[in-house]
Amino acid sequence: MKISTAESVVMEALWRNSPLTSEAIIAEVGGPNDWTEGTVKVLISRLLKKKAIAAQADGRRYLYTPLVARQAYVRSESQGLLDRLFNGRLAPLVTHFSDGDQLSDEDIAALKALIEKIGR
């Protein structure tokens, strides 16, 4: 399932705190992104059609919850990035970020620890 960048903003709000009403979603994501109520409701509608979120009636309103786990979404997006730009290989991605001093000492330490863990 492909979730657009704008839709992912709504998903992030739901992953942080769900269930949420459309009003709560609008309040959380509308202002910071300069989106109207209509824009946010269109995004919610698209996510419902994609079955990325569910709606449960709660009186005269609906409560929205994510059906896609954030971890699964991140895994899929990460793999898509690797496939599109680095032929599915992680090493060229890390090399790309290491060029130009984009990795902090903390990043390097975390990568070393990960490699050590994988090597066991």
Question: What is each of the regions a protein language model found here?
Answer:
Residues 20-29:
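Short acidic, hydrophobic short linear motifs in intrinsically disordered regions
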Residues 41-45:
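Short, hydrophobic-biased segments on the C-terminal half of alpha helices
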Residues 8-13, 24, 92:
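Pre-recognition alpha-helix immediately N-terminal to the DNA-recognition helix
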Residues 51:
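Glycine-centered, phosphate/nucleic-acid-interacting loop/turn motifs that mediate DNA/RNA or nucleotide
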Residues 3-6, 58-76:
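Short, cationic-aromatic polyanion-contact patches
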Residues 14-18, 31-32:
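Short helix-capping/hinge SLiMs at alpha-helix to coil transitions
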Residues 55:
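Short beta-strand "wing" residues that participate in macromolecule-binding interfaces
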